A protein has these predicted regions:
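Flexible glycan-contacting loops in extracellular carbohydrate-active proteins
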Residues: 198-229
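Extracellular, beta-strand-rich glycan-interacting domains
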Residues: 1-4, 41-50, 107-116, 222-251
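Structural detector for short beta-strands of small beta-barrel domains
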Residues: 262-284, 290
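Disulfide-stabilized netrin-like
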Residues: 288-380
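Beta-strand acidic-aromatic groove motif in beta-rich domains, primarily in extracellular
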Residues: 118-126, 347-351
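Extracytoplasmic low-complexity segments
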Residues: 1-87, 93-99, 129-131, 245-257
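A carbohydrate-recognition surface predominantly in extracellular/luminal proteins
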Residues: 38-41, 97-116, 135-139, 173-175, ...
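Extracellular glycan-interaction surfaces
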Residues: 63-86, 109-118, 138-202
Length: 382
């Protein structure tokens, strides 16, 4: 079974009067996610989906695209895995700004899974900013809390005063988050239930300025968030409780249907290396895998059922060489965390280099942590 959805409890301080009737009016909801494309400005479900919004004015679809940066990659469910990197959205910034200025309303929806909880941690997850201290809105992980900064005519330059703490999160647990605002009301729904609501947030967006939409970090910031994002939708309208519940219910079905995959940890001796490709061989690709042959010495977790295996490693990420792979030497022992290659369908469309003579061996994918690109060393030798 997939990961369970955590229970939510609304804190006493988050209680507020029931939404006014006009706020509870729900758009006609289709039997899917999202339930309505009314006032939908940005949509990114996962890499396999078209991520398109039909433009009624132009009578054509508009596609929401972006680029992985740093060590970011896609996971087996085609979600953004932003550990060590970011997802840079393309062609949406001015449209998002103008849309929100027209309505002075905003709704941010996403499925968020954090990998790390630490009291010292402060990492932006979703930002519409251009530098630290000047964002229009920011969803932040601060310790084990989700925090929201919203810039209005009644707040400071980046919406951090007042800072709004929305919800406490747990590592490894997917949460469907909706944060919705109109002047005089800020509300947060987690997994279809209201967990925070306040009437103290006021002001329009007249002080908003041109910014950049980024996932996994903040423009000009040094801290990268570690976790996965998917099911992202941004609207220039307030979302009703009914719509938040509807969207959660439909996305939850997809996540609950997912099955965990086997993870292996082995000590293995590098037997044969594929020659390191040059960046010129990537052509238009930003990422590439290289395949090596290993002789398994010890199985520390799980049993790969073979004494000799093929392992695919990232050799380029964001067109930068992964030095931990280039540093590997034939005859050396390495500790590897692995998954079966076939359990990672997101790799099918990635460029792959393989010179290994024994091409029919069991095939695995290296998921070892702490991979670094050029200028940083991370090969783990035993």
């Amino acid at each position: 079974k997939g990961k369970p959805w955590p229970k939510q409890e609304e804190s006493p301080t988050s209680k507020a009067p029931t939404e006014s009737p006009w706020l509870s009016k729900t758009a006609v909801l289709a039997n899917t996610w999202p339930g309505s494309e009314d006032s939908l400005i940005f949509l990114w479900e996962n890499r396999r989906k078209p991520n398109e919004i039909f433009d009624n004015k132009a009578q054509t679809p508009r596609y929401c695209n972006g680029r992985l940066r740093g060590l970011a990659k896609f996971d087996r469910y085609h979600a953004m895995d932003l550990t060590g990197g970011t997802f840079e959205v393309q062609g949406i910034d001015q449209m998002l700004l103008e849309a929100c200025l027209r309505t002075n309303q905003l709704a941010l929806e996403a499925v968020v899974t954090t990998e790390t909880i630490s009291p010292e941690l402060t990492c932006p997850i979703i930002t519409f900013s251009s530098e630290q201290g000047s964002g229009n809105f920011t969803l932040v992980q601060k310790g084990d809390n989700l925090v929201f900064h919203l810039r209005t005519a009644k707040t400071d330059a980046d919406g951090t005063k007042p800072e709004t703490t929305l919800y406490r999160i747990d590592a490894g647990q997917p949460n469907h988050i909706v944060v919705a605002y109109h002047p005089g009301r800020l509300v947060c729904y987690v997994n279809g239930k209201r967990v925070f609501s306040t009437v103290d947030m006021v002001g329009n967006f007249s002080n908003w300025s041109a910014q950049r939409l980024l996932f996994g970090g903040e423009w000009g910031g040094k801290q990268d968030w570690a976790g996965q994002l998917e099911g992202i939708a941004i609207y220039n309208r307030f979302l009703s409780p009914e719509e938040a519940k509807h969207n959660y219910a439909h996305y939850a079905k997809r996540l609950k249907a997912r099955q965990p995959v086997a993870r292996f940890v082995v000590r293995a001796r590098l037997r044969e290396k594929t020659q390191m490709p040059t960046i010129a061989k990537l052509q238009e690709y930003a990422r590439a895998l290289v395949v090596h042959t290993y002789d398994v010495q010890n199985a520390l977790k799980g049993d790969p059922d073979s004494g000799r295996i093929l392992v695919a490693h990232w050799v380029f990420l964001d067109r930068q060489p992964v030095l931990s792979i280039d540093e590997k030497r034939v005859g050396q022992l390495y500790r590897l965390e692995l998954e079966r290659f076939d359990d990672n369908p997101q790799l099918e469309s990635e460029m792959q280099f393989n010179d290994c003579q024994e091409f029919d061996l069991p095939f695995f994918y290296d998921v070892s942590p702490n991979q670094k690109t050029e200028g940083q060393k991370s090969a783990t030798k035993l």
